[in-house]
Amino acid sequence: MMTIVYVSNAGHTEQYAEMLSRKTGLKSLNINDAVKILPKGSSILLMGWVMGDSIQGYKKLCKMFDIKVICAVGMSKYSSKPESLRKTNSLPDDMPLFVLPAGIDVNKLHGFYKLIIKMMQNSISKKNGEKTISAEEKELHDILLNGRDSVSDEHLDDVEKWLSQYDFS
C-alpha cells in the first residue's frame, strides 16, 4: 500500500496531504513519522513544499523509500515550473510530477524562510513600479505582499486521476 508522506512548513502541504488521504483512503504521514514507522523501500507519494525550486524532503526520502509520484506544493501555479523542478532536484524523466498552488502565510513561516520572504517582499515593492512586469510576476508579487491560501480539492484532480490507474496495495 502506498503512503502519502508530506513535508510542510506553513500547513498548506499538510492540508493537501489530508485532503488526498480522505479522498483516496491512503494513509498520510509527516516526514518525521514516516522515517520512524515505514519500512525502508516502502512505496510513497511525496508531497513537499517548494523553496527555490527545491522540493523539501526529496533528497532524504529518495534514499529511503520508493517514491512513485511527487506533488510539489508552491506559492502559485506560476511559482514553480516542472522543468525547473526536475532539473534542480535531479528527478528522473519518468517520475510523475504534479505542481499544486498553495499560497503563503508569512506569519506561519519561521526563521530563515521568513527572512527570505521579507527580503523578497522588499525587492518586489521596488519592482512594482516598473511597467514591464508580467501577469505571472504580478500574481507572485500579490501573493508575497498580501498572502493567499490557494489550497483546494480541485487542484488534486489530476493526482487522483493518476492514482486511479494503479493498484498500490
Over which residues does each language-model region extend?
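N-terminal beta1-alpha1-beta2 submodule of the flavodoxin-like/Rossmannoid cofactor-binding fold
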Residues: 1-64, 161-169
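FMN-binding flavodoxin-like domain, especially the glycine-rich phosphate-binding loop
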Residues: 50-169
